[in-house]
Amino acid sequence: MKTSSLIAMRLIIFYLLSVVGRSTAAVEEAPASSLHIPRLNPLSSNLEYDEPSEKRAYAYISEYKRLPLYNFGIGKRWIDNSEDKRTRPFSFGIGKRLRDYRFGIGKRNSGYRPLGMDFSVDNMDFHSREDNLDDFIDDKRGGQPFSFGIGKRGWKLPMGEMAVSGRRLNDVVGPKYLLGLGKGLSENENLIQ
């Protein structure tokens, strides 16, 4: 009886060790890719991973000349059908346009005319800054002060008073910066700064 219980105990221990051995062997198995060896199990593997950085840099430099030029982004101007879009240099950026910027925090102009992503330009004079430079400066430096923020309120001059010009044309002496969270101004308040 002792021998049968001893044999049974040995079989149970052998079975338990074989189950535990399988789970540890599954953990120690090398993954299919050699890229994961140093990160997943550095103690079980003595292999050194050597990244072929010279080959990557060389491939990047040799392929660089064959890559197309980048024509993407927010505010992309247009695609002209008369020329290949790959021959133009980088034409991307936030709000990149030939006319004044009409976006952002505190934008002064009320008319927002977004450009589409892909269209041909019929009137190139409209996008030229040379012929309407005065209009551009008037729009850019108009009499409207900086007024931005959440809950901003406009300001009015008291009855009978006129806006006094500052150093430059269209500079208004008055509350130029009206910003803040929920900042409200009553109509009867005189705004003197």
Curated annotation (Swiss-Prot):
Protein name (Swiss-Prot/TrEMBL): Allatostatin A
Chief site of localization: secreted
Residues spanning the signal sequence: 1-25
Propeptide residues, chain positions: 26-64, 78-84, 109-139, 169-193
Tissue specificity of this protein: Allatostatins A1, A2 and A3 are expressed in brain, antennal lobes, optical lobes, gnathal ganglia, the retrocerebral complex and thoracic, abdominal and ventral ganglia. Allatostain A4 is expressed in brain (at protein level).
Disulphide connectivity of cysteines: none
GO biological process: neuropeptide signaling pathway
Cellular component GO terms, alphabetical: extracellular region
The entry's keywords: Amidation, Cleavage on pair of basic residues, Neuropeptide, Secreted, Signal
Modified residues (Isoleucine amide): 74, 94, 105, 150
Functional summary from the UniProt entry: May act as a neurotransmitter or neuromodulator.
Positions of post-translational Serine amide modification: 165
Subcellular location: Secreted
Family: Belongs to the allatostatin family.
Keyword Signal tagged: yes
Keyword Signal annotated: yes
